[in-house]
Regions:
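Conserved N-terminal beta-strand and adjoining loop/helix that marks the start
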Residues: 1-17
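Conserved hydrophobic "DFG−1" position in protein kinase catalytic cores
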Residues: 10-11, 19, 80, 99
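Conserved Nudix-box catalytic region and its N-terminal flanking loop in Nudix hydrolases
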Residues: 12-51
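A short coil-to-beta-strand element that immediately follows conserved catalytic motifs
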Residues: 55-64
Length: 150
């Protein structure tokens, strides 16, 4: 059975994207996380944004579903906006928050996030993508799964 995740691309008025720094690995990521049993991907995305950032979010479009068969992982990616709340920069899962230009994404990001963000920039809507993980970041992800940190 595939693990389900839900993540949100949220832009501010300056067209900057909201990123969170993870506590489990020193990488930047989109706000999001695991879909709980009985919860829709949309509900999980909104909940995870609040838990990780302190912000309330409203979803406006589904960018797509990204499947990683090697890891039995399926990630739902949404576009949304921040509708309220107060930033929480240091939470249970999050070591920091920042708004960055879509053209100047950090070097150290969770595997495949830049690809997902580029799909968004190129106008992708409701796509289905099968991703093949490569390199060191994929190895980190596999190690985390084996250690039960996901």
């Amino acid at each position: 059975m595939y693990t389900q995740g839900a993540f949100v691309i949220a832009l501010n008025e300056s067209q900057q994207i909201l990123l969170v720094k993870r506590k489990d690995v020193p990488l930047w990521d989109l706000p999001g996380g695991r879909v709980d049993p009985g919860e829709s991907a949309e509900e999980a995305a909104v909940r995870e944004v609040l838990e990780e950032t302190g912000y309330n979010a409203a979803l406006s479009a589904k960018i797509g579903v990204y499947q990683r068969p090697k890891f039995q992982d399926e990630q739902h990616l949404f576009f949304g906006s921040i509708t309220g709340g107060q930033a929480v920069a240091d939470g249970i899962e999050t070591a920091g928050l920042k708004w960055v230009s879509l053209e100047r994404l950090p070097l150290f990001m969770v595997p495949n996030r830049k690809r997902q963000i580029n799909d968004f920039k190129n106008g992708a809507q409701d796509v289905n993508v099968t991703v093949k993980d490569r390199g060191l970041l994929a190895a980190i992800d596999l190690l985390k799964r084996r250690l039960g940190k996901r």
